[in-house]
Curated annotation (Swiss-Prot):
PROSITE patterns: ODC_AZ (PS01337)
A GO CC annotation given for this chain: cytoplasm
Family, as annotated: Belongs to the ODC antizyme family.
Protein name: Ornithine decarboxylase antizyme 1
Domain of life: Eukaryota
Gene, per the UniProt record: Oaz1
Induction entry: Induced by a ribosomal frameshifting mechanism in response to increased levels of intracellular polyamines.
PANTHER family, alphabetized: ORNITHINE DECARBOXYLASE ANTIZYME (PTHR10279), ORNITHINE DECARBOXYLASE ANTIZYME 1 (PTHR10279:SF8)
Quaternary structure and interacting proteins, as annotated: Interacts with ODC1 and thereby sterically blocks ODC homodimerization. Forms a ternary complex with PSMB4 and OAZ1 before PSMB4 is incorporated into the 20S proteasome. Interacts with AZIN2; this interaction disrupts the interaction between the antizyme and ODC1. Interacts with FAM171A1.
Record GO terms (molecular function): enzyme binding; ornithine decarboxylase inhibitor activity; protein-containing complex binding
GO biological process: cellular response to leptomycin B; cellular response to oxygen-glucose deprivation; cellular response to polyamine macromolecule; negative regulation of ornithine catabolic process; negative regulation of polyamine transmembrane transport; polyamine biosynthetic process; positive regulation of intracellular protein transport; positive regulation of proteasomal protein catabolic process
Native organism: Rattus norvegicus (Rat)
Xref: InterPro entries: Acyl_CoA_acyltransferase, ODC_AZ, ODC_AZ_sf
Keywords: Polyamine biosynthesis, Transport
Keyword Transport: yes
């Protein structure tokens, strides 16, 4: 089960790297995301004076390169890099909320693909947000470029629990560029957690020759087997 693996992700050497360097470096890495999963979207990082929000993923949307052939809905990206007139934060609806997680869903024209923003509150002054695509029983997450920012370990653990317990997901996919300098370290870390490399041509991932995909299969216990 995923809970039995979460402690290992907190202590893995990849996530330990987030403590190295200063806060300025962590913020820089949080905003440098890999090329988009949708051909029509762009990612970004935003912050507020009273709260730090680390957006740890590109603005993923239901597009032809990410498990859907429906055009990505127009977005106004925080930081002024969007060219649309609609701000996704204004039209998003709350899907799930507790004392730590706040998950919102952005409207799309495809009822089979859902764009989620999973915000984890670490402290009163810091939040980490993962943007993901929920499609066909799988949750798809794109790792940010560079070392994962401070706080990503705890937020990622909470995300995996949410995928298992609330979404009842069958798989959680991660992806990152094949040419990353820390590719070997990421492969070791996530393999240790139970993730497996997705081979080219897998029916559940888009054709991205520039990206490496890994998958974690969520296996739920049969209630009758607990005794």
């Amino acid at each position: 089960m995923v809970k039995s693996s979460l402690q290992r992700i907190l202590n893995s050497h990849c996530f330990a790297r987030e403590k190295e360097g200063d806060k300025r470096s962590a913020t820089l890495h949080a905003s440098r995301t890999m090329p988009l999963l949708s051909q029509h979207s762009r990612g970004g990082c935003s912050s507020e004076s009273s709260r730090v929000a680390l957006h740890c993923c590109s603005n993923l949307g239901p597009g032809p390169r990410w498990c859907s052939d429906v055009p990505h809905p127009p977005l106004k990206i925080p930081g002024g890099r969007g060219n649309s007139q609609r701000d996704h934060s204004l039209s998003a609806s709350i899907l799930y909320s507790d004392e730590r997680l706040n998950v919102t869903e952005e409207p799309t024209s495809n009822d089979k693909t859902r764009v989620l923003s999973i915000q984890c509150t670490l402290t009163e002054a810091k939040q980490v947000t993962w943007r993901a695509v929920w499609n066909g029983g799988g949750l798809y997450i794109e790792l940010p470029a560079g070392p994962l920012p401070e706080g990503s370990k705890d937020s990622f653990a909470a995300l995996l629990e949410f995928a298992e317990e609330q979404l009842r997901a069958d798989h959680v996919f991660i992806c990152f560029p094949k040419n990353r300098e820390d590719r070997a370290a990421l492969l070791r870390t996530f393999s240790f957690l139970g993730f497996e490399i997705v081979r080219p041509g897998h029916p559940l991932v888009p054709k991205r020759p520039d990206a490496c995909f890994m998958v974690y299969t969520l296996e739920r216990e049969d209630p009758g087997e607990e005794d």
